[in-house]
């Protein structure tokens, strides 16, 4: 992933840089053709105060708005404090990774997924980032993935496999285990 300036505003990150990186990721991997005929919708909610919506058609046409959209495929929420600290510490891999690595397999997995998964990402200073993701507007079943920010970056970069992390104790999973396993295609 491109190095993101640690002083970038949330608005600039989510309205300009993130869509640019996602588009470049799809183009450079040659995945636009496989995404023809798809419409990926994403909503990012920061503390209920700021909302960013994305509609990506055919993997090439990106429409970004600073307002909510109805029935997004994926809705992500986190606190403004967590978002600002994620930017300042360069720990954006888990948040931005799926957008930059969208494939038809991940799109299809998301389309069929119904539930909520949470990530609790522990920082070196002991603080924790909390990211909540709701798929297809359904918030049950629920599972929580607990890992370090360093390990989450490795998952996003495909340097660590989630199942291996779970088996070795690097990641803990709480909640609905079947749903947790259903999320695996998003991270592999």
Located regions from the model:
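Feature captures hydrophobic
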Residues: 1-188
